[in-house]
């Protein structure tokens, strides 16, 4: 028990020390605020002198409330007395601050403490200054009436939302509340005025506080007794919410005196409203609103606009018509801060919503001028001041939204044009249309004869291959395959190409077979010098004339001979082919008639017959497989062939190079065997062939023994053999070129 009592005594001592410190701090605050009032309660330049206590100033018409109407002066003497009291206060305020605490107490204690029931004498001493400075006001019904009319509210920002609702419903009605004692000391009012404690309970719903309109003496709310807290809690809310009710010997329509504590709450509320709506002060430029109101922010808040509402906006808008807050000098054509409808409530924290509100309010006159249908939709209803929230559901009115956006676009100087959105699937259809159009133009360009340059590579350019997803290299086989498969009739063309190559092989064999029959005297040791002398010239002539029509095919490797020739008009291409064929036939007949006995078949010397036939067969299969990548040729084994594959020495002379097609034709003509790809008849053994004699006269061991027998004249037959080999290669090359051109022209 003793320990408990000592603990309780220690706690009481600590509480007493804390209370003493708080009271001392409160007294210092009161003295400093009083000095500030005295310092700034004087005119600056030519501005009217406004009494901080009453918010009134003198005009030629009479005493006027700041931002309000003219006060009715029933008793002119009392008004003059009230105007003289601030001047008297200037002289005696410093003295009051000095000897105020020493004055005796003239005030009766309001009540007993709720806990101990003891009388708090300290509160009487702290309020002695107010009673000493207060004038002698007789106890009359006027005092109670003024108290009922002009009871003020302090620190509305710290109150809950229920106080606003109750304050709006009890305007003009009397609410009687039984006062409760408190240890909290009140603030000292301005010197020369009477004061009473006016406190409100922050947590009791049965004792609501008055609304902001009760600051206005023109809209009083009457209570018989002042409110004091029920407990001894000394929180910031209770300390800052202490206020006073000062009385003046005015009549009912006059105004009472107000202290700095009452003005502080109103000024704080006004400044908070101004700071929360800063864009409204620079909205005239219309640049700040457009920089912050972008599409990204609008869409982010739009999805929640049907659920998010500005807290307290309805109450502040409703009370703003009746409540006025001192803000600036009243000017004709300019209302007080309470009339500014382009400001938001302090509790609205969404920047995008603030900008939307300010934009709608400021530009409302322009919107009325631009679109008469704007009247159909009220932006800010008269009863509610909440913002217009757009619903993002499927039932949203698109016409109304489009009209609103059009108006915003017309009003704002910065035009923000939204990009047209492409629906899903529309882009794919558009891409398909572009691709079809591109293919059509490409075909038309290829069919046009004047727009066809001679191409030395594949029919499709590298750009076309890149467009179709093929390789970037112009000569790549993958691009050829891609282009070939992309054609509509690729299979039919592949089949026709296969048949054409078979026909080409047959004609090559037939052309090779007719040569030995005309070369019966090719192995004779004696030759005609006239023919020997004229043969080089004829060979060069044939070379030049043949190259005029087949130089394009000679310049391309065998792996690229599949390239489609220039696509021309069918009739023009057919006539050109017939002319070349007739010219070639004439030259061939003329050459055969001039030298009927000197035509010999150049052989691949130094290779055995069986080995040469096998090599020729595999080279032919590989070459044809490369030329026509058709499944018909995929079953055969392919060996890499080279244009220099038949590089052999002819009768001990220097080697010559011939294309693979020439070597194939010569080898098959010499050997006489027919391959399954070239169904040619085997020549008779009785026919004069150069193979038997050459087999006896020349060594067959890999071209090492190239000695000529004593009875042969190698010196004269060797150049003739070279010339005949060149003639045969050129002739077969021309045949192959013309057949390919004919085939490709048909395929086109």
Swiss-Prot record:
There is a cross-link at residues 354, 581, 586 (Glycyl lysine isopeptide (Lys-Gly) (interchain with G-Cter in SUMO2)). It is found in: Nucleus, Nucleolus; Chromosome, Centromere. Signal peptide: none annotated. The modification Phosphoserine is found at residues 123, 140, 185, 201, 211, 412, 448, 473, 486, 496, 595, 642. Residues 191-226, 512-574, 670-748 are annotated as: Disordered. GO terms for biological process: CENP-A containing chromatin assembly; chromosome segregation; regulation of DNA binding; regulation of protein-containing complex assembly. Residues 524-562, 688-699 have a biased composition (Polar residues). According to PubMed:17256767, highly expressed in the thymus with lower levels in the placenta, small intestine, liver, skeletal muscle, and colon. According to PubMed:17823411, highly expressed in testis, and at a relatively lower level in thymus and bone marrow. Significantly overexpressed in many lung cancer samples, compared with normal lung. InterPro entries: HJURP_C, HJURP_central_dom, Scm3/HJURP. One of its GO terms (molecular function) is DNA binding. Residues 565-574, 721-748 have a biased composition (Basic and acidic residues). Keywords: Cell cycle, Centromere, Chaperone, Chromosome, DNA-binding, Isopeptide bond, Nucleus, Phosphoprotein, Ubl conjugation. GO terms for cellular component: chromosome, centromeric region; cytosol; kinetochore; nucleolus; nucleoplasm. Pfam families: HJURP_C, HJURP_mid, Scm3. Interacts with CENPA (via CATD domain); the interaction is direct and specific for CENPA since it does not interact with H3.1- or H3.3-containing nucleosomes. Heterotrimer composed of HJURP, CENPA and histone H4, where HJURP interacts with the dimer formed by CENPA and histone H4 and prevents tetramerization of CENPA and H4. Identified in a centromere complex containing histones H2A, H2B and H4, and at least CENPA, CENPB, CENPC, CENPT, CENPN, HJURP, SUPT16H, SSRP1 and RSF1. Interacts with 14-3-3 family members in a phosphorylation-dependent manner. Interacts with MSH5 and NBN. Centromeric protein that plays a central role in the incorporation and maintenance of histone H3-like variant CENPA at centromeres. Acts as a specific chaperone for CENPA and is required for the incorporation of newly synthesized CENPA molecules into nucleosomes at replicated centromeres. Prevents CENPA-H4 tetramerization and prevents premature DNA binding by the CENPA-H4 tetramer. Directly binds Holliday junctions. PANTHER family: HOLLIDAY JUNCTION RECOGNITION PROTEIN. This is Holliday junction recognition protein. It comes from Homo sapiens.
């Amino acid at each position: 028990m003793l320990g408990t009592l000592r603990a309780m005594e220690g706690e009481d001592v600590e509480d007493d020390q804390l209370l003493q410190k708080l009271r001392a701090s409160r007294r210092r605050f009161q003295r400093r605020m009083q000095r500030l009032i005295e310092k700034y309660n004087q005119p600056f330049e030519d501005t009217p002198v406004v009494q901080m206590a009453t918010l009134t100033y003198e005009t030629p018409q009479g005493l006027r409330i700041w931002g309000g109407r003219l006060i009715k002066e029933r008793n002119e003497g009392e008004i003059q007395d009230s105007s003289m009291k601030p001047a008297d206060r200037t002289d005696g305020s410093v003295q009051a601050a000095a000897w105020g605490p020493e004055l005796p107490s003239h005030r009766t204690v309001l009540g007993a403490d709720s806990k101990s029931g003891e009388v708090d004498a300290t509160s009487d001493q702290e309020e002695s200054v107010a009673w000493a400075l207060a004038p002698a006001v007789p106890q009359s019904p006027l005092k109670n009436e003024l108290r009922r009319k002009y009871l003020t509210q302090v620190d509305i920002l710290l109150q809950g939302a229920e106080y606003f609702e109750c304050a709006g419903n009890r305007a003009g009605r009397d609410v009687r509340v039984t006062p409760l004692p408190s240890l909290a000391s009140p603030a000292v009012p301005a010197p020369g005025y009477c004061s009473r404690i006016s406190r409100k309970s922050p947590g009791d719903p049965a004792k609501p506080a008055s609304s902001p309109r009760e600051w206005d003496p023109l809209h009083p709310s009457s209570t018989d007794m002042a409110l004091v807290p029920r407990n001894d809690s000394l929180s910031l809310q209770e300390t800052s919410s202490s206020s006073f009710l000062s009385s003046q010997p005015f009549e009912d329509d006059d105004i009472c005196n107000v202290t700095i504590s009452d003005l502080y709450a109103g000024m704080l509320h006004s400044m908070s409203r101004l700071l929360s709506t800063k864009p409204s002060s620079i909205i005239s430029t219309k640049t700040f609103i457009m920089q912050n109101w972008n599409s990204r922010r609008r869409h982010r808040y739009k999805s929640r606009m049907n659920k998010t509402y500005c807290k307290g906006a309805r109450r502040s808008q409703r009370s703003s018509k009746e409540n006025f807050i001192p803000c600036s000098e009243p000017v004709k054509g300019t209302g007080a801060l309470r009339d500014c409808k382009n400001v938001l409530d302090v509790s609205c924290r969404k920047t995008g919503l603030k900008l939307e509100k300010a934009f709608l309010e400021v530009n409302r006159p322009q919107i009325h001028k631009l679109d008469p249908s704007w009247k159909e939709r009220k932006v800010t209803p008269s009863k509610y001041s909440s913002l217009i929230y757009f619903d993002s559901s499927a039932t949203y009115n698109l016409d109304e939204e489009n009209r609103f956006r059009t108006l915003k676009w017309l009003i704002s100087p910065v035009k923000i044009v939204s990009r047209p959105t492409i629906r899903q699937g529309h882009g794919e259809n558009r891409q398909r249309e572009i691709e079809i159009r591109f293919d059509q133009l490409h075909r038309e360009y290829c069919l046009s004869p004047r727009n066809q340059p001679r191409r030395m590579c594949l029919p499709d350019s590298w750009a076309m291959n890149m467009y179709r997803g093929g390789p970037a290299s112009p000569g790549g086989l993958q691009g050829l395959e891609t282009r070939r498969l992309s054609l509509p009739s690729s299979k039919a063309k592949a089949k026709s190409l296969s048949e054409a190559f078979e026909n080409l092989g047959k004609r090559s064999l037939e052309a090779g077979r007719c040569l030995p029959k005309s070369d019966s005297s090719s192995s004779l040791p004696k030759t005609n010098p006239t023919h020997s002398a004229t043969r080089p010239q004829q060979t060069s002539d044939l070379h030049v004339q043949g190259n005029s029509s087949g130089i394009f095919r000679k310049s391309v490797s065998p792996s690229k001979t599949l390239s489609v020739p220039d696509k021309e008009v069918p009739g023009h291409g057919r006539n050109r082919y017939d002319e070349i064929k007739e010219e070639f036939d004439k030259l061939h007949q003329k050459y055969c008639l001039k030298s009927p006995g000197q035509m010999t078949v150049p052989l691949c010397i130094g290779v055995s017959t069986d080995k040469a036939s096998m090599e020729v067969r595999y080279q032919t299969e590989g070459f044809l497989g490369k030329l026509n990548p058709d499944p018909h040729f995929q079953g055969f084994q392919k060996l890499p062939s080279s244009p220099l594959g038949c590089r052999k020495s002819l009768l001990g002379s220097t080697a010559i190079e011939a294309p693979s097609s020439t070597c194939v034709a010569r080898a098959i003509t010499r050997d006489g065997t027919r391959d399954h790809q070239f169904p040619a008849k085997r020549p008779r053994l009785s026919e004069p062939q150069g193979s038997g004699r050459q087999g006896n006269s020349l060594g067959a061991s890999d071209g090492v023994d190239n000695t000529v027998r004593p009875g042969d004249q190698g010196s004269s037959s060797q150049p003739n053999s070279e010339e005949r080999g060149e003639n045969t290669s050129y002739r077969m090359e021309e045949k192959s070129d013309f057949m390919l051109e004919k085939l490709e022209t048909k395929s086109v």
